[in-house]
Every structure is written in structure tokens, then in C-alpha cells.
């Protein structure tokens, strides 16, 4: 009303206002001492345009449904789709998970692999048997010599040769050093993913010492190419066995410190107990091996059930879990490190003298001293490293107990110097296939704990 008065140019004027389109007068309280204002016809006509009187043209016109609003529909609630990785620091490489979350609860976990695929199995078909060996270092690049050991045993089975005893003891010695390397990486990075940073720094100092043993024996810290078909590349340098003994004597103290930090830690137990539970039946159905199988209560270790090299001559125990959760698998790995120290001590005590390569000039390259005096040795050396040696036709599946599980090599020979087919069985591939089952129903943060306990390396998964 005040706006209407201001529009007419009057302030405080008592009047009766004619509502547009109707003959109803609205009384207005008159002010004292002011004459009453009456709106004229011209003023009232300016509001007449808003009223539409029915006519022939407008008889069939219907007003638009201004108030005919659709009723509200129920909102469709969908689960969140989350991409975990491949650049996530807890993905342990190039893992990509497409997860379906209900709040923070995992409903589905779909691993997408292949981001580190390099065509290793096909590349091996174009190399000689010796040239194919370095590819195995780059599969599981945390446990290098164990991969070499599996491939060398497969080639030796096709060639029907057996390396000398000293070479076999050296293989077992460095196989257990490699197991320590792998389990240090597995346990400490698992703890690092869950927020415990100290074990990572403590045990990586010990890991550095083992890399020095690698370097002294082969010249390389990681990709050693030391274990070869027919034996090992070269003998142990002087003083190395003494240094390994000193290391193994002190390493058990580092393991005690690790267990003081983690084993009875309330936070660590809450994050790992009853997380990622796998029953014994499920572990067998998924094809699990190694710690993933033993953590569920199945005592299966190829070093015991199908011993290779000289594992039948050493004494060690196989730790087994009971619940099949992340905590049991952690305890299994720590105890396996202690058993590896037992095996290392026996290797140092029982190391025999003798040759480190099979005495067959068609398979093993000659010594440098012989090459300088014998023309035949020089020819053998040249032929071995250019054309390679012919392997009799046949096929073999050879498996070893790698730190992550059963690492198998299916090797097919057609009688030439190059493999016809080399199929690699990686333990991490089967473990990753069970990630959906293990993580379903857990929180998003528990998926990190489950990935850590699986100990996955994508060099061997993607190949």
C-alpha cells in the first residue's frame, strides 16, 4: 500500500483504492488534516491490461499448468565407484582397482592389471637359453635369484644335467638371502602403509647389507644373473662367507626389535586381526601358495614336499597360521625369516669345496685362463655366447618355493638353441584374483592392509 501511495505522488493521504478489474473499494484510514484523494479513471485504466475478458478468440484458451508440477520422485541411491591407483603409494606398483563403495564399505573390488606388461614370455622365444636368463630377474624384481633358480632348474632338467654340490649349496644360500630381502620388503612396507614408519628404516639398513653380498658375488645389486643353467656364474669371493655369518648372527636381533614394535602393538593388531580372512578351502580353490596358503593353516612348502637342489639336506620348520588373516600372515613371514637364518647357518657350515659349474664344455663357458691357452676353449666361449647350446626336445614344468609362493616355469624345447615356449606361473597373479573376495565387506582403509599382506609385485603379475 505504501508503494501504491508513493506511485501516486501522495504521502500520508487517506483514500480508497479501486482494485484493478473489480468494483471493490478498499478503505484507507485517512490522515488528520489532509483531504481525501480519489483515483481518477485514467489512473485506474493503467491496471486494466492485466485482465483478460472472454471472447471468441480466447474461449478455447487454457492457462498453462503453472501449479501442475510433477510430484517429487524418490532419489535413486547408487554406490560410489572409486578408482584406487595406479598412482596410489599403497598400490605397490601399477595396480588399479575399480571399487564399488557403499559409504566406506567395499562392495566390489575389481583389479585392472596389465600396466606393466612387457611381453616377457614372447621375448624369451627369440633369445638363447642363456640370454633369456636376465628376463627372470625383472619379473619379481624383489626376489631376483629365486626366479633365476627356477629357470635354471628347468633348463637343467631338459638337458639332463645336475650342477656340482658346491653350486647347489651356493644356490640355497643365496635363495634364503633373497627370501630375507623379500620378506623385509613385504613386512616393512605393509607396516608403512598402515602408518608404522620405524620398521621400514630399521630393516632397510640390513637389506642394504644383503645387496652388498649380491654385489660382491655377481657385480650387480639387484639384477644379478648369477644362478645359471649348470651352476653359478662364479665362485664366492674370499671373506664373503665370514661376512654373511656376522650378518646372520646380528640379524636375529633386528627381528626381535621388529616384533617388539609390531607383534603386540595394539594399533597393529586392530588393523590386521580378522582382516582379509581366507579359509583353507578358499585358499585352495583360488590357487593360493606360499604364505597366503600357509597362513590359512595348510602346511605346504615345496622345499619340504618337493625338495630341489640341497633342501633335503637342511633342517628347517614350516610356520603355519590358524585364522588366515593379515596378522597370521605377518607372523608367518617373520618366522620364515628366522628359519631362513637357520638354513643360511647350515649352508655356511656344510659348504663343500669343488667346482661351481657342470663339467660340460657344451653348456658351461670355459675359464678365462683356459681361453688364453686353448683355441678350442676360445671357440666354445664364442659359440656359447652367440649361438647358445642346443637343448633336446621336450617339455618340463619346474616349480620352486619363491618367497611369494610357487613360482613355476613351463619350458618347451624343440631341439634348437631357443625355447619354443616359456610359460611363467607367478604366485602373485592368483593372490590378486582373490582380492575381491578378501576385501568384500571391509572398510576402504582395510583394502590397503589386504594389498600389503598379499605381497604383490607387478613385474611377475603382468610379465
From Swiss-Prot:
Residues annotated as carrying N6-acetyllysine in the record are: 62
Q: Which GO terms describe its biological process?
A: aerobic respiration; cellular response to oxygen levels; gliogenesis; mitochondrial ATP synthesis coupled electron transport; mitochondrial electron transport, NADH to ubiquinone; mitochondrial respiratory chain complex I assembly; neural precursor cell proliferation; neurogenesis
Name any cofactors this protein relies on: [4Fe-4S] cluster
Q: What is its EC number?
A: 7.1.1.2
Q: Cofactor binding mode, per the note? A: Binds 1 [4Fe-4S] cluster.
Transit peptide span? 1-33
Question: What reaction is this protein's catalytic activity?
Answer: a ubiquinone + NADH + 5 H(+)(in) = a ubiquinol + NAD(+) + 4 H(+)(out)
Q: Which residues carry this modification: Symmetric dimethylarginine?
A: 118
Question: How does the record describe the protein's post-translational processing?
Answer: Dimethylation at Arg-118 by NDUFAF7 takes place after NDUFS2 assembles into the complex I, leading to stabilize the early intermediate complex.
- Keywords assigned by UniProt? 4Fe-4S, Acetylation, Disease variant, Electron transport, Iron, Iron-sulfur, Leber hereditary optic neuropathy, Membrane, Metal-binding, Methylation, Mitochondrion, Mitochondrion inner membrane, NAD, Oxidoreductase, Primary mitochondrial disease, Respiratory chain, Transit peptide, Translocase, Transport, Ubiquinone
Where is this chain's protein located in or outside the cell?
Mitochondrion inner membrane
Matching entries from InterPro entries are given as: NADH_Q_OxRdtase_suD, NADH_UbQ_OxRdtase_49kDa_CS, NDH1_su_D/H, NiFe-Hase_large
Any one GO molecular function term = oxygen sensor activity
- Tell me what effect the entry lists for residue 446 to N: In MC1DN6; loss of catalytic activity; no change in Km value for ubiquinone-1
PROSITE patterns assigned to the protein according to its UniProt record, in alphabetical order: COMPLEX1_49K
Instruction: Name the residues that bind [4Fe-4S] cluster.
Output: 326, 332, 347
> In which domain of life is the source organism classified?
Eukaryota
| Disease annotated for this entry | Mitochondrial complex I deficiency, nuclear type 6: A form of mitochondrial complex I deficiency, the most common biochemical signature of mitochondrial disorders, a group of highly heterogeneous conditions characterized by defective oxidative phosphorylation, which collectively affects 1 in 5-10000 live births. Clinical disorders have variable severity, ranging from lethal neonatal disease to adult-onset neurodegenerative disorders. Leber-like hereditary optic neuropathy, autosomal recessive 2: An autosomal recessive form of Leber hereditary optic neuropathy, a mitochondrial disease resulting in bilateral painless loss of central vision due to selective degeneration of the retinal ganglion cells and their axons. LHONAR2 is characterized by subacute bilateral or asymmetrical visual loss, optic nerve pseudoedema and peripapillary telangiectasia in the early phase of the disease, and eventual partial recovery in some patients.
Q: How does it assemble?
A: Core subunit of respiratory chain NADH dehydrogenase (Complex I) which is composed of 45 different subunits. Component of the iron-sulfur (IP) fragment of the enzyme. Interacts with NDUFAF3. Interacts with NDUFAF7. Interacts with CERS2.
This chain's function reads: Core subunit of the mitochondrial membrane respiratory chain NADH dehydrogenase (Complex I) which catalyzes electron transfer from NADH through the respiratory chain, using ubiquinone as an electron acceptor. Essential for the catalytic activity of complex I. Essential for the assembly of complex I. Redox-sensitive, critical component of the oxygen-sensing pathway in the pulmonary vasculature which plays a key role in acute pulmonary oxygen-sensing and hypoxic pulmonary vasoconstriction. Plays an important role in carotid body sensing of hypoxia.
Cited HAMAP family: NDH1_NuoD
Family, per entry: Belongs to the complex I 49 kDa subunit family.
Q: Kindly provide the name given to this protein in its UniProt entry.
A: NADH dehydrogenase [ubiquinone] iron-sulfur protein 2, mitochondrial
Which source organism does the UniProt entry give? Answer: Homo sapiens (Human)
